[in-house]
C-alpha cells in the first residue's frame, strides 16, 4: 500500500556500509515497510534485459551527468566496478572548448548539450560528415552574434578525449576480471 510501501533503492557500487545504512534509515523514516538496496549496475543490467543471474559475464557502462560507471556482473552480483569522472558534463565542456578553439565561437552549456543530444557521436561517420545542425553563439573576434553549421564528424572530434578516457576505463575493467568473463563480454 502507499501508506506502508516496500521500496527498492539503487545505490552506487562504491557506497560504504555507513552510506547504505543512512539510505535505509532515511527510507524507514519516510514510512517504508521494507527497504531493499540494489547496486545501480545490477538494476541497469536487469532493465537492459541482460542475463544477470546466469554464470556468464555482462558489462554495464552507465554514462551519467558527472561520472561514468563501468561494472561487470555475473551470477547476480557485481564482479568488478569502477567509475571515472568523464561523463555528460565533460562532453559538454569538450564541445564548448572545441567551438572556442576551432571556430572562435562562444556557446553556453545549453547549446553544447543540445549539440551533444542532436548530433553527438563517439565516432566519426563512416563516410562524409554525417548529420549537421546550425549553432548560434558569440563570435570571439567581433563580439557579435554568429551562426555556423557544425557536423557530426566535428562533434566526434570534440568528444574524442572524454570518450577515449571512458574506453580506457572499459579496457582496464576487462583486464581486472577473470578471462572467462572477458570472453563472454568481448
Residue ranges and their predicted role:
Residues 1-63, 71-186:
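Nucleotide/phosphate-binding catalytic cleft detector across ATP-hydrolyzing
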